[in-house]
Structures are given as C-alpha cells and as structure tokens.
A protein has these predicted regions:
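Signature of long, low-cysteine stretches enriched in small and polar/charged residues
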Residues: 101-102, 106, 110-177
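Structural recognition of the beta-strand scaffold that forms the well-ordered cores
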Residues: 159, 181-184
Length: 216
C-alpha cells in the first residue's frame, strides 16, 4: 500500500513539473491577425503590378502595353509636359504602370478612368515640391485645384482635386515600399463630388506588396 502511495506521489510531482514548464506558453496571448479590408457591397479586389485595390465591380482592367499613348495623355493632365519638374513620372511607363482601366458603368462619352503609376526615381522628392509642380502645370487654372492631406491608417496621402469645364481628376500621391505612388481618377467635374468618397475608399483599401530585397 505504501508503495502505491509513493508511486502516486511521484506521478503527481512529475505532472506538476511538466505543467509548470508549459505554463508560460499556455498563458501567452496569441498575436492578433493582420486586419484585411472587407469589401463593401459591390466592391471587389482588383490585382495590379505590386498592388491590389478595392473598386466597384463595374471596373474593367485594360492592357496598359496596348494603350501607352492614351496613358501618357492621361498622366500629362496631372504631370504636364517634358519641362515639368516631375516629368520623369512618365518615364518607363510600360514597367511603371501598376493598373489601368475604366468604369464600364459610366457613359462611354465621359468614362471614369483609373491610372495607378509607381515610380522609384521620384520617391525622394518632397511632396511639397510635387504640389508646386502641379500648380506650375495648371498655371492660371490653379484656382480650380484643391489640395488636402488625408490619413488612411498608417498611410498619409496628398489628394489633388481639379475640375474645370469638361476636365476633372482626383490624384492621390503617397510613398510606400520605396516608391512614389500616384492614383489618378479621371472623370468629368460634375462627377467628382459624387464619386469622391468611393475614390477615397479605394485608395484607403490599397495593399502594396513589399519590394524584393536586392541580392548582394
């Protein structure tokens, strides 16, 4: 009988020792999962080069390589010509266009287009200089330009909004993963106010893929 009690005591001691060793791990709070934006009704994920974005499901991606001329014309509304301080934003478009397409629900005569461009050369340029460059491009039409700094989580974005006569656009500029990003929505001025919240939502939803570390 005494032998049985001794064995039971030894077993309990071993069990307590094992439990004590594992206790820190059991008490550890698991790391919360990384939040992923949940699409609102009618919004879907679109994949681009090094990024993804939530847009209305009526958007349709186009082949940027087949439409470089149209992309250049679109981008020059924001950048200006080759004498602009930020003209290098139009360089290497074939590799720097991250997404290009349009909203098929908009009238064909005045489509809403979306162009997303990334650029490494301009990543070090201060946003203040980009603001000055945009004003320089617009010249006497600067009065039709509105500039605002927005914060979407950890992302600080400068939004340029321009509308005059039949020309309108909202451009979102920010820096992430060693690149300057420009998200440019082209739409008639009458549509800017109605779509602004959707544009903001889409830019806030963007997920930028980490850039690969160069191999030494």
């Amino acid at each position: 009988m005494k032998k049985n009690w001794t064995l039971l005591l030894v077993s309990c001691t071993l069990l307590l020792a094992i439990t004590a060793c594992n206790l820190p791990g059991l008490l550890q709070t698991p790391a919360p999962p990384e939040p992923t934006p949940t699409p609102d009704f009618g919004m879907v994920w679109y994949q681009g080069a090094g990024m993804q974005i939530l847009l209305p499901d009526t958007y349709e991606q186009r082949d940027a390589k087949q439409d470089l001329g149209g992309i250049l014309n679109t981008l020059e509304q924001f950048v200006g010509g080759q004498d602009s301080p930020i003209a290098s934003l139009t360089d290497n478009l074939e590799s720097n266009v991250a997404w290009w397409g349009e909203d098929t629900a908009a009238p064909a005569v005045y489509p809403t287009q979306l162009l997303i461009v990334k650029n490494q050369a301009l990543e070090g340029v201060p946003i203040s200089l980009i603001k000055s460059a945009v004003k320089l491009v617009l010249g006497s039409d600067t009065g039709s330009l509105q500039t605002e700094t927005l914060t979407f989580g950890p992302r600080e974005v400068t939004r340029f909004t321009y509308g005059k006569e039949s020309t309108g656009w909202s451009a979102y500029v920010f820096k992430e993963q060693g690149l300057l990003w420009v998200v440019l929505f082209i739409t008639p001025p009458a549509n800017l106010a109605a779509q602004q919240d959707n544009f903001d939502y889409s830019v806030a939803s963007m997920i930028i893929a980490p850039t690969a570390t160069p191999q030494s």
